[in-house]
Amino acid sequence: MKCPYCSAPDSRVVNSRPSDDGASIRRRRECLRCNRRFTTYERAQLEPLMVLKRGGQREAFNPDKLLRGLILATEKRPVDPEQLRAFAYGFEDEVQASEITSEEIGRRAMTFLRPLDDVAYIRFASVYRDFDSLERFIEEIQGLKGRGED
């Protein structure tokens, strides 16, 4: 490992231990030239979850983008922001695939929001399903009411 102080190419590991609940390894190193110590972290690099968009393009999954949509849907609603954050940042771990459609992300987000708050659910659904008329809102609300009576 290259020394950050003198750029020497060689160092020795003085101490090594798990970090971040075992998700990475913290190593204390000592430069063999200048004898200064520095810390490095080693983490497995996984292939990113790819999102297949409606237009056919592909992009890496971004939990911040999902979180923004959830926050907008739940704005001024009695929903714990930590629940939203946990869902968005845990989403990639829950998906057992290398690729997912944006439609599936939307479906899963709606499934997550439904028991939390009806208004947030409708807000998210209106964007995800691209409601273009008042009738679409009414249909969705009636569907919610029908499921609530089961």
UniProtKB/Swiss-Prot annotation:
A single MF term (Gene Ontology): ATP binding
Q: Name one GO biological process term.
A: negative regulation of DNA-templated transcription
* Xref: Pfam families: ATP-cone, Zn_ribbon_NrdR
Q: Where are the zinc fingers (unnamed)?
A: 3-34
Where is the region Disordered? 1-22
PROSITE patterns, A to Z: ATP_CONE
Q: Where is the ATP-cone domain?
A: 49-136
**Keywords associated with the record:** ATP-binding, DNA-binding, Metal-binding, Nucleotide-binding, Repressor, Transcription, Transcription regulation, Zinc, Zinc-finger
Q: Which residues form the signal peptide?
A: none
User: Has UniProt tagged this entry with the keyword Transcription regulation?
Assistant: yes
What sections of the sequence does the record tag as coiled-coil?
none
Q: How is the cofactor bound?
A: Binds 1 zinc ion.
What cofactor is this protein dependent on? Zn(2+)
Question: Would the keyword Electron transport be found if you checked this record's keyword annotation?
Answer: no
Q: Which InterPro entries match?
A: ATP-cone_dom, NrdR-like_N, RNR_NrdR-like
Write out the function statement from the record.
Negatively regulates transcription of bacterial ribonucleotide reductase nrd genes and operons by binding to NrdR-boxes.
Q: Give the family, as the similarity comment puts it.
A: Belongs to the NrdR family.
Q: What is this protein called?
A: Transcriptional repressor NrdR
Organism equals: Deinococcus geothermalis (strain DSM 11300 / CIP 105573 / AG-3a)
- Lineage, uppermost ranks: Bacteria, Thermotogati, Deinococcota, Deinococci, Deinococcales
